[in-house]
């Protein structure tokens, strides 16, 4: 009898464990659906830890499921990204710096990961209007979006594979700056759909204007620096050239000409250098003195015949001294 009770206890334990396992599988299946992995949706950004303060969505990015009809057939203004689900309200944060963005130039397809493959009607992709207010901080509204999807992928009731790419049949709509793509996965055999928001940077507009401005400013600064360097180089070259001219004038003219040339040269050099003496430029007083000294030295130097005569005279004088001593 004890043995029988023991078997009954074991059987009951196994039954409870089996029910718990089946319940877990059922709930996992019900909760598991899908999300956009590239370009990374807000939900996926939260799952990956690339976005912060996400709340519950970081644990179940696949679960943004709500009744069909968004963004236009039913009202959901300000709550489109969360699909009106209060537990995922963090997805409705809005603003150019509220979410990490993906460069639109690198987007040639949209990639989904499905944790449950439902029969599907289609996938549709909407984008914010070209003139939408990208600086707004209130949640995304239907009026922010183009009324027609720029991409529709029909499934005709078929279930997608575990992962699926939707290639762009043509280029992304022409945009500038920060924009949001609203992706809708419509399930065929239920009343629900899944919703994902993707943040893109098209460049050359709102989100990158400060960066462009900074780059432009940096370029301008670099250009100014280059111009300044070129001006300095030009000034230095000019100063050296003018100093050389002054020296030549000193060698071939009078002391007065040399001095005036030096004054003129150094006057220009001083003006070009903003009144400061450059390391490669001699002060005018030194140039004048140098020219005068060279001039005097050249005037006093005897020619070759004089030097030869002096040599002969010294040799003759030395010979006479030797003769007298002998």
UniProtKB/Swiss-Prot annotation:
Signal sequence interval, chain numbering: 1-32
Enzyme nomenclature, EC number: 1.14.99.-
Keyword Oxidoreductase included in the entry's annotation: yes
GO biological process, alphabetically ordered: chitin catabolic process; polysaccharide catabolic process
Entry keywords, A to Z: Carbohydrate metabolism, Chitin degradation, Copper, Disulfide bond, Glycoprotein, Metal-binding, Monooxygenase, Oxidoreductase, Polysaccharide degradation, Secreted, Signal
Subcellular location: Secreted
Gene3D superfamilies xrefs: chitin-binding protein cbp21
Cofactor: Cu(2+)
Domain Chitin-binding type-4: 33-200
Compositional bias (Low complexity): 207-281
Binding site for Cu(2+): 33, 118
Physiological role: Lytic polysaccharide monooxygenase (LPMO) that oxidatively cleaves alpha- and beta-chitin with C1 regioselectivity. Catalysis by LPMOs requires the reduction of the active-site copper from Cu(II) to Cu(I) by a reducing agent and H(2)O(2) or O(2) as a cosubstrate. Exhibits enzymatic activity on U.maydis fungal cell wall chitin and Boosts chitin hydrolysis by chitinase GH18A.
Protein name stated in the entry: AA10 family lytic polysaccharide monooxygenase C
Protein source organism: Mycosarcoma maydis
